[in-house]
From Swiss-Prot:
Domain KRAB: 4-75
Gene this chain is encoded by: ZNF727
Compartments reported by the entry: Nucleus
Record-stated family: Belongs to the krueppel C2H2-type zinc-finger protein family.
Role according to the record: May be involved in transcriptional regulation.
Name used for this protein in its record: Zinc finger protein 727
Classification of source organism: Eukaryota, Metazoa, Chordata, Craniata, Vertebrata
Keyword Oxidoreductase: no
One Gene Ontology cellular component annotation held by this UniProt entry: nucleus
Sorted UniProt keywords: DNA-binding, Metal-binding, Nucleus, Repeat, Transcription, Transcription regulation, Zinc, Zinc-finger
Statement: the UniProt record of this protein carries the keyword Protease: no
């Protein structure tokens, strides 16, 4: 039995065929060929590096004059291994995964499928290549022969012997990371495994990428170019994979299902991230603060807290942001867009968080509870301010008189005493006020609105303080000090001006 070579599992294209592939299919081809070579290398079958791999590593076209002539002269001489062929003829599950993991459901229409296979099937030499894959992969499961210099194991003694000859002929280089001996031709590849070499760098922000295709996609963040357009809704995307995911919004397709909770996802990466919720795995760790994250994108965002990087810039005002979501929200200030609408009252909001807070007005939901006194609040900020009543903390201090306050809003109001600022102006008569509630009460003089009604006699008033004064005519209550002043029934202000 002859040894399996890279040519047995390679896909070769003529220039005409290569031009028929789009950029995504060309990237897929590069990734699959490099991975196939990597698998042969790990099995000890890649004795020499093929020209095709050299071309792909240098990001050149995967053909030259010699290959072009060979393909033209022998059209059946190059095997066209595709996911469809591998599945149809059941070559081997392990080998199929190498292709399927990269190609997924991609439909490479330009590859010659069944016709080529039928034509190649008549050739005994090519059939032996398929059989060679079977025999090689079956044999490597046991891996009975291991070479102590480099640690590689082999299922076939003939391959093991051939591998030993290579080390006897060539000078070996020892990897400092794992201690393996490598030939010079493979030493760079071995180093990249440990260092995760990122050779493509963005000139705008300095970000490094492993692949040139990743750098091309990243550059679109800066240029704003979105060449991939959805035919359904017209939305555009920077990369083809994002468009593929988006299309599933229209089709409702969720092909990736969690075996634990049966939740389905539109893309495989989302399922992988979701599984970590069940396993508790957090493989991405910050070197600065050692905080761990479930997905790489979360770690990337987190790192900006330490570096201060703000890669997302507003074209209108030049303000920069750490995250693209923050930029998207900021842009609504310029556009006036308010996409979040309350179903109860129809009021629109710029941010989803504001809508969630607003909904509590209709629901009377008070999710934040004080552990000291049991009082509940609609908003967390109100609970935080309330807790300071128990702790006595007053972190907001006036620089003019030294008076301190429990919340920042009270300090802002207090500062107006020193500044004599009256920021609230009546549009009807031009009168100004220090406090917004005073302006609200004043406006009712012009509108005639009297929302505060006495339950005893039915008389109505423009402000809550007037109602409180009136109620005393029924009760006969005459407070003589500020301590005896009752709190307003219809508002949140404390009555301070009654003597």
């Amino acid at each position: 039995m002859r040894v399996l070579t890279f040519r047995d599992v390679a896909v070769e294209f003529s220039p005409e065929e290569w031009e028929c592939l789009d950029s995504a299919q060309q990237r897929l081809y590069r990734d699959v060929m490099l991975e196939n070579y990597g698998n042969l290398f790990s099995l000890g079958l890649a004795i020499f590096k093929p020209d095709l791999i050299t071309y792909l590593e240098q990001r050149k076209e995967p053909w030259n004059a010699r290959r072009q002539k060979t393909v033209a002269k022998h059209p059946a001489g190059s095997l066209h291994f595709t996911a469809e062929i591998l599945l149809e003829h059941d070559i081997n599950d392990s080998f199929q995964k190498v292709i399927l993991r990269k190609s997924g459901s991609c439909d490479l229409n330009t590859l010659r499928l069944k016709k080529d296979y039928q034509r190649v099937g008549n050739c005994k030499g090519q059939k032996s290549s398929y059989n060679g894959i079977h025999q090689c992969l079956s044999a490597t499961r046991s891996k009975t022969c291991q070479y102590n210099k480099c640690g590689k194991a082999f299922g076939l003694c003939s391959i093991f012997t051939e591998h030993k000859k290579i080390f006897s002929r060539e000078k070996c280089y020892k990897c400092e990371e794992c201690g393996k001996d490598c030939r010079l031709s493979d030493f760079t590849i071995q180093k990249r495994i440990h260092t995760a070499d990122r050779s493509y760098k963005c000139e705008e922000c300095g970000k490094a990428c492993k692949k040139f295709s990743n750098l091309t996609e990243h550059n679109r963040v800066h240029t704003g170019k979105k060449p991939y357009k959805c035919e359904e809704c017209g939305k555009t995307f920077t990369c083809s994979s994002a468009l593929t995911k988006h299309k599933r919004n229209h089709t409702g397709d969720r092909p990736y299902k969690c075996e634990e909770c049966h939740k389905a996802f539109r893309c495989c990466s989302d399922l992988t991230k979701h599984k970590r919720i069940h396993t508790g795995e957090k493989p991405y760790k910050c070197k600065e603060c050692h905080k761990a994250f479930r997905c790489c994108s979360d770690l990337t965002k987190h790192k900006r807290i330490h570096t201060g990087e703000k890669p997302y810039k507003c074209n209108e005002c030049g303000k920069a942001f750490m995250w693209i979501s923050a930029l998207s929200q900021h842009n609504r200030i310029h556009t006036g867009e308010k996409p979040y609408i309350c179903e109860e009252c129809g009021k629109a909001f710029t941010y989803s968080s504001t809508l969630i807070s607003h909904k509590r007005i209709h629901m009377e939901l008070r999710p934040y509870k004080c552990e000291e006194c049991g009082k509940t609040f609609k908003w967390f900020s109100d609970l935080t301010n309330h807790k300071r009543i128990h702790t006595g903390e007053k972190p907001y201090k006036c620089e003019e008189c030294g008076k301190s306050f429990t919340c920042s809003s009270n300090l802002i109001k207090h500062k107006r005493i020193h500044m004599e600022v009256r920021p609230y102006k009546c549009e009807e008569c031009g009168k100004t006020f220090k406090w917004f509630p005073d302006l609200t009460n004043h406006k009712r003089i012009h509108t005639g609105e009297k929302p505060y009604k006495c339950e005893e006699c039915g008389k109505t008033f423009t402000c809550s303080s007037s109602l409180i004064k009136h109620k005393r005519s029924h009760t006969g209550d005459r407070p003589t000090s500020a301590k005896n002043v009752a709190k307003p029934l219809g508002g949140s202000q404390t009555l301070l001006n009654i003597r």
